[in-house]
Amino acid sequence: MALYHLFSHPIERAYRAGLCSKAALFLLLATALTYIPPLLVAFRSHGFWLKRSNYEEQPNVRFQHQVLLVALLGPEPGAFLAWSTYPTFNRLQGVHLRVPLVSTREEDRNQDGKMDVLYFKLELPLQSTEQVLGVQLILTFSYQLHRMSTFEMQSMAFLQSSFAVPGSQLHVNGDLRLQQKQPLSYRGLDVRYNVSVINGTSPFAHDYDLTHIVAAYQERNVTTVLSDPNPIWLVGRAAEAPFVIDAVIRYPVEVISYQPGFWEMIKFAWIQYVSILLIFLWVFERIKIFVFQNQVVTSIPVAVPQGEIRKEHLS
């Protein structure tokens, strides 16, 4: 009579040995070599602990309508005109004070509630004999980030341009970019730099010196700079025409560097560890099968149906 394959079920093979046997010692060693080396490999390959991460955010930037201007004149050396929105600075200038006409406008182009660009125009009246050879200009801003930690600071854009020939207009088109010397925190409120760039209440001339202002500003770990201003210097001014500064300053999306939190570090480390662990699990599983099947270490093989193994585990 012919025989047919009617039914089948898998059989698990168990290997039994004492807890103090060579088989138990081998299994303990194999387990240790399965789980510990992946941790060492992941750690020694660097980048195991995520110390810095990045994200994108559109900053909330507003122009504070605080301006400090120094116009360098020629051909006499040391001649200049100055003006600012700080009354004390203006009083200190004496005959060098010249009040310009300033107009500004901020625009939210994508209607997301955050300003995207500043249009700044300054017209400095000049006498027919006065010639502008260079400009130093400070504009101050309120700068805020909210996606991770709440970061607030008062920052500035510093523009300095000088040319060999007298000019009639200076056109500037650049981005207000964030510069970080250290990452921000991933949570909390950071207002350490939410102080005026220029101390407008000080009666001392030293506090309005550009060298002092820029040096103190550069001591910060987080600043803004006017990036790629692309200055265009136009010549040929009419006798009674003012000197014009026309600036377009954009507030672009920034890549913010921050210190990740504990659980983010654990998640990043766990992904690296598991990806290496899977390889070790596969390798040592086959090593254990070879060792026990070929009785490299003494053990007693027992065939156990899968259903009985499940019952043993449940019991």
Swiss-Prot record:
UniProt cross-references to InterPro entries, sorted A to Z: TMEM231
Lipid bilayer topology: Multi-pass membrane protein
Domain of life: Eukaryota
Signal peptide positions (record): none
Residues carrying sugar: 194, 199, 221
Localization in the cell: Cell projection, Cilium membrane
Pfam families in UniProt: TM231
Transmembrane domains' residue ranges: 23-43, 262-282
One GO location term (cellular component): membrane
GO biological process assignments: camera-type eye development; cilium assembly; embryonic digit morphogenesis; in utero embryonic development; neuroepithelial cell differentiation; regulation of protein localization; smoothened signaling pathway; vasculature development
Subunit structure: Part of the tectonic-like complex (also named B9 complex). Interacts with TMEM107.
Identification of the protein by name: Transmembrane protein 231
Organism listed in the record: Rattus norvegicus
